[in-house]
UniProtKB/Swiss-Prot annotation:
Plays a role in processing non linear or branched viral DNA intermediates in order to promote the production of mature packaged unit-length linear progeny viral DNA molecules. Exhibits endonuclease and exonuclease activities and accepts both double-stranded and single-stranded DNA as substrate. Exonuclease digestion of DNA is in the 5'-> 3' direction and the products are 5'-monophosphate nucleosides. Additionally, forms a recombinase with the major DNA-binding protein, which displays strand exchange activity. Its EC number is 3.1.-.-. Interacts with major DNA-binding protein; this interaction increases the nuclease processivity of the alkaline exonuclease. The gene is UL12. Belongs to the herpesviridae alkaline nuclease family. GO terms for cellular component: host cell cytoplasm; host cell nucleus. InterPro entries: Herpes_alk_exo, PDDEXK-like_dom_sf, Restrct_endonuc-II-like, Viral_alk_exo. It comes from the Viruses. Its main location: host cell. The keyword Nuclease applies. The record marks E176, D232, E252, K254 as: Required for function. It is found in: Host nucleus; Host cytoplasm. This is Alkaline nuclease. Gene3D superfamilies: 3.90.320.10.
Length: 520
């Protein structure tokens, strides 16, 4: 493990001995709910718990997890390095003994050790009983938590639409790294220039490889610890004179499985659209391709109307109108949605259209437009009613608290790719036509789809609406305490909430007893 993974002396020392494995069997047996339940069963009153800010309780819970990780042999000495204590401190002790800088280092450590996101056990357990964009709903005046957020959230097989959902998830997991490589090669001009200088970029990592470069783990809300966000890709730039963080670019990547097709299947409706788009690239043929499926990934709505929440991308350009489009007379949407629809309506997306791979050189590149550039702009903007916008909104809120003076630019990046032809299977494709300052070429793996379109959509956010989230963390903690103390009387007899929702409830000290040591 290279010491450049973590910027700064603290991270360099920490990384040497405590890089955590992605799989830690048993860690899901202790959630934030269990931390609160232990407090209730030990005789603490709700009033005493609520007298300490929720961020300190979240940190106390994390200290319990870290103690378990050390005791289980997954790391050594992480607890004293992070919390300056050989025993998990209480929320009161953390508030009294740790400085804001100490707390920030703990939160950045959590971020750095959860970069694999869904592939990381620590990420999974920390997201339990945590408000995220997916557990928020947006009502008329402000966001609030969904009724079912305070429970173990597990993805189960079966049910209507599962196969379709599983396909979309698999396509996304496989091709997010493909989109990341395209962003590095064509979209963000400074990403690779100083890769060996981690201080230029997002605080804790520049990525081990092109697969995970500039990836982000779980970043917790510094105010309450009750909200969290996991960004797909973030790039930080510092002021060369002051070394202060000046700019942060955040990319939320979405891979659209609904456009997957094989061009060898001439019966597929997208096959002909694809050929026309490559033969005559332009706004009209790109539009026809995007609208070439039953439920297009871009929704047209008339300028005097409001969109639905079905798709993340919108257009109200006259040339994109469909014959059956009708203006809605309903007053739909919350205040925050209406405000951001107004702000983003004039935004235009940057679109990269990729030609066919060259099998002689095993390479692929975007087409060159008459302007001489490798991209064009189209009248496509983000839908503030869609979950993707809300995800980006929460991410920006959480990140802005760490870097209040930095300029944060948000982008939704939509990747559309096709299945490989028979003669394309197994090929690693070099990305050509990108920046000339790359130290070495970036290539797509043999498992990646063949890129068709990469759509970069800027997202405009009104920070005045951050106040809508600022009180939500405290309210969520108060709700958590109320629910936990209400359940405490039955907790000993009921199945324990934790791994599998059926584990035996151990005592507080039992958690810290190591199982058979697992060395990594």
């Amino acid at each position: 493990m290279s010491s450049t993974r973590h910027g700064g002396n603290f991270q360099l020392e920490l990384a040497a001995g405590t890089l955590l494995p992605k799989e830690m069997p048993g860690i899901n047996a202790f959630t934030f709910y269990d931390y609160l339940l232990d407090l209730a069963q030990s005789g603490a009153s709700p009033e005493s718990v609520l007298s300490v800010e929720p961020i300190y309780h979240r940190l106390a819970y994390i200290s319990r997890l870290v103690a378990w990780i050390d005791a289980s042999g997954f790391s050594h000495g992480t607890l004293p390095r992070l919390f300056l204590s050989t025993e998990p401190p209480t929320a009161e002790q953390i508030k009294s003994n740790l400085s804001p800088s100490d707390i920030e280092q703990i939160l950045f450590f959590v971020e750095s050790e959860t970069k694999q996101q869904v592939g990381c056990d620590l990420w999974k357990v920390l997201r339990q009983f945590l408000l995220t964009a997916s557990t928020l709903k947006w009502v008329k005046n402000r966001p609030c938590s969904k009724p079912d957020w305070f429970k173990v959230n597990e993805f189960r097989n079966g049910g209507a639409g599962y196969a379709r959902q599983a396909m979309a998830i698999t396509f996304g997991l496989t091709n997010e790294s493909c989109a990341r490589k395209l962003i590095m090669t064509y979209v963000s001009g400074d990403l690779h220039r100083h890769q060996n200088d981690s201080g230029e970029f997002f605080r804790l990592d520049v990525g081990e490889s092109d697969e995970d470069a500039f990836s982000c783990g779980l970043l917790l809300d510094k105010r309450s610890g009750m909200l969290g966000a996991s960004m797909d890709m973030a790039v930080m730039r510092k002021d060369p004179e002051t070394a202060a963080v000046a700019e942060i670019d955040v990319f939320e990547i979405k891979c659209r499985a609904k456009y997957t097709f094989c061009p060898e299947n001439l019966m597929h409706p997208l096959s002909a659209c694809y050929e026309r788009m490559l033969d005559s690239p332009g706004e009209e043929t790109i539009r026809d391709f995007l609208f070439g499926i039953r439920a297009p990934g871009v929704e047209y709505f008339p300028p005097d109307s409001v969109p639905s929440a079905a798709e993340a991308l919108l257009t109200c350009a006259k040339g994109w109108a469909s014959p059956d489009a009708k203006a809605s007379t309903r007053d739909r949407g919350s205040l925050i949605e209406k405000r951001h629809l107004q702000l983003n309506r004039e935004v235009r997306s940057t679109v990269y259209l990729f030609g066919e791979p060259c099998l002689k050189t095993n390479s692929i590149r975007p087409i060159v437009w008459p302007s001489g550039g490798t991209s064009c702009e189209l009248p496509i903007f983000i839908n503030p009613k869609h979950q993707n916008f809300k995800q980006i909104f929460v991410q920006t809120y959480v990140l802005a608290d760490y870097y209040p003076d930095a300029k944060i630019s948000q982008y939704l990046v939509t990747f559309i790719g096709r299945s490989r032809r028979a003669n394309e299977f197994g090929r690693v494709l070099r990305l050509d036509g990108g920046r000339e300052d790359l130290a070495e070429p970036i290539s797509l793996d043999h498992i990646h789809a063949i890129p068709i379109l990469l759509i970069k959509t800027p997202v405009v956010i009104d920070r005045d609406h951050f106040s809508d989230l600022s009180s939500l963390g405290k309210e969520a903690f108060e709700f958590s305490v109320k629910e936990t103390w209400g359940n405490a009387a039955d907790a000993a007899a009921a199945p324990r909430i934790g791994r599998g929702c059926a584990a035996k409830k151990p005592g507080p000290t039992e958690l810290l007893c190591a199982p058979e040591s697992t060395q990594h």
